[in-house]
């Protein structure tokens, strides 16, 4: 089961943002209805987590600028009204049910995240795997109190693939033949819908020709979402990223 919230048009009044992209959040109880106290706390906690994760993402993009030796604000300017999404997932079987899984079954197949950076909280339960540079999958279990950070496809485009987006997957958390409960909260910091993505200063030279054509983050997200839902690559500029995912599925 999963529950999502994200950036809304009301978060940035006066910018004329598209409500199709910056959609209003839908909570279990509508405005004006009697809301159980526990549900009020659920909303307050989730909104607090959303804003804290957004601040962490902004801090990280500033760190990225320093590490890449680009002018301050170069990357953060692409996310002044970022399309951000917090997705909370509870991998659990209904009470009284059981299931058998084989070694090839996935909770979520090989993929990269679409945006700039992802901030992930997860239980200390095995399941998440990351593909290493040597081509092997590695289990990732966070240290107590730690967050996991994935680079997204926008970051790969900005660095002309000098920093690659993190290829990862989720396997069912099985222990002694029983699927264990696993929870995760992923904050996707994708950037402004209208921001144009092209290589940062210093990322292109005679030895490193441009690998991607400029496009807006909105166009990039639309191509990614359309491809994943339609099981096709509907934008030729996504072929490079798709090839990495397909190659990883064979390892």
Q: Where on the chain are the PLM-derived regions?
A:
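Peripheral, non-catalytic segments flanking oxidoreductase cores
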Residues: 1-251
